[in-house]
From Swiss-Prot:
Family listed: Belongs to the cytochrome c oxidase subunit 5A family.
The protein, known as: Cytochrome c oxidase subunit 5A, mitochondrial
Keywords linked to the UniProt accession: Acetylation, Heme, Iron, Membrane, Metal-binding, Mitochondrion, Mitochondrion inner membrane, Phosphoprotein, Transit peptide, Ubl conjugation
Membrane topology classification: Peripheral membrane protein
Residue range covered by the transit peptide: 1-41
Role played: Component of the cytochrome c oxidase, the last enzyme in the mitochondrial electron transport chain which drives oxidative phosphorylation. The respiratory chain contains 3 multisubunit complexes succinate dehydrogenase (complex II, CII), ubiquinol-cytochrome c oxidoreductase (cytochrome b-c1 complex, complex III, CIII) and cytochrome c oxidase (complex IV, CIV), that cooperate to transfer electrons derived from NADH and succinate to molecular oxygen, creating an electrochemical gradient over the inner membrane that drives transmembrane transport and the ATP synthase.
Pathway involvement of the protein, from the record: Energy metabolism; oxidative phosphorylation
UniProt subcellular location: Mitochondrion inner membrane
Secretion signal span: none
UniProt-listed GO biological process terms: mitochondrial electron transport, cytochrome c to oxygen
Organism listed in the record: Plecturocebus donacophilus
Length: 150
C-alpha cells in the first residue's frame, strides 16, 4: 500500500516537472502531498469480560428477536477469538427455542466444539454447564444426534 502511494507521488512529481526532468524547476510539494505514516488504532474504551457477557446475554434475551437477528448474533459471536461463556450460549439456545429454530441450536453447539479447538476439556465443561437447559428445552447435542460420526 505504501509502495503504491510512493509510485503515485513519483508519477505526479514527474508530471509536474515537465520535459526537463525532476531536477529542474519542480515545485516543492506542499504539506498535503507529504506521505505520513499513520496508524489507525481504536481509541475506544475496552470492554470487560463481564460487560461482554452481559451485552450478549441481553442481545439474545430480547423478547422480539427475530430469526435474522439470531443468526447475525450467532455469526458475530463465532467470529470472536473465544469460546462463549455458558450463560451466553444458554441465552442463545433459549432464543432459538422461542423461534422454534432447532437447526440453529445444533449449529451453536457445533460452533462451540469447533471454537474449543485442541482443548478437549472445554466442550465437555460447556455441555455439563448447559445440561439442565438442554434437558429443559429438549435439545439434543450433535453427539446424541450422531452428527459427530458423519
Amino acid at each position: 500500500m505504501l509502495g503504491a502511494a510512493l509510485r503515485r507521488c513519483a508519477v505526479a512529481a514527474a508530471a509536474r516537472a515537465g520535459p526537463r526532468g525532476l531536477l529542474h524547476s519542480a515545485p516543492t510539494p506542499g504539506p498535503a502531498a507529504a506521505i505520513q505514516s499513520v496508524r489507525c488504532y481504536s481509541h475506544g474504551s475496552s470492554e470487560t469480560d463481564e460487560e461482554f457477557d452481559a451485552r450478549w446475554v441481553t442481545y439474545f434475551n430480547k423478547p422480539d428477536i427475530d430469526a435474522w437477528e439470531l443468526r447475525k448474533g450467532i455469526n458475530t459471536l463465532v467470529t470472536y477469538d473465544l469460546v462463549p461463556e455458558p450463560k451466553i450460549i444458554d441465552a442463545a439456545l433459549r432464543a432459538c427455542r422461542r423461534l422454534n429454530d432447532f437447526a440453529s441450536t445444533v449449529r451453536i453447539l457445533e460452533a462451540v466444539k469447533d471454537k474449543a479447538g485442541p482443548h478437549k476439556e472445554i466442550y465437555p465443561y460447556v455441555i455439563q454447564e448447559l445440561r439442565p437447559t438442554l434437558n429443559e428445552l429438549g435439545i439434543s447435542t450433535p453427539e446424541e444426534l450422531g452428527l459427530d460420526k458423519v
